Amino acid sequence: MGGVFGVASKSSCTMDLFFGIDYHSHLGTRRGGMAVYGPNGFNRSIHNIENSPFRTKFERDVEELEGNLGIGCISDMEPQPLLIQSHLGSFAITTVGKINNEEELVREAYANGHIHFMEMSGGRINATELVAALINQKDSLVEGLQYVHEKIDGSMTVLLLAPEASTPPGTGWAAPRCSSEKRGGLLCLLRELRIYQPGLQ
């Protein structure tokens, strides 16, 4: 299990993000993480919460994390959110789910080009990093999220934070097999693809 939470605000989102993630603490017992975007770019904090509550581990980080856009998670598996820099720009990403065809997707990623993954304990690959690698195979974040939706066998919720979300040429926000909304600076892939962009209600 696990839980994700995101905030898009006109002012500081840090306290809302902190309490929103803490509310999900019952969904996981291993890792907690927060990532915010503000005037100084991205800032992130991840802690092990196996032996102490989320609030205790993150109460000092709240003073240093400044921004009006933020995502975070409680995770039973991999440390996240991850900060990614690629040809699509910089973004933060967090996921919750189970990828049944993970080995197949990793083999395809290796076959498609020069790519590597950070290895976790026990030889496992961070599923969130795999999702980011799938997104980065396309020409826009929107197309990448749609590709994730098509490729993953299993259950996957993706919360993605990008300073600016670009759309592929000629497609607008509506695309086959997905519905879209625009809100804040968060891109979210649920059962249907929902897209959120800054500055729109």
Spell out what each predicted region is.
Residues 1-201:
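Conserved short alpha-helical segments that host acidic/polar catalytic motifs at enzyme active sites
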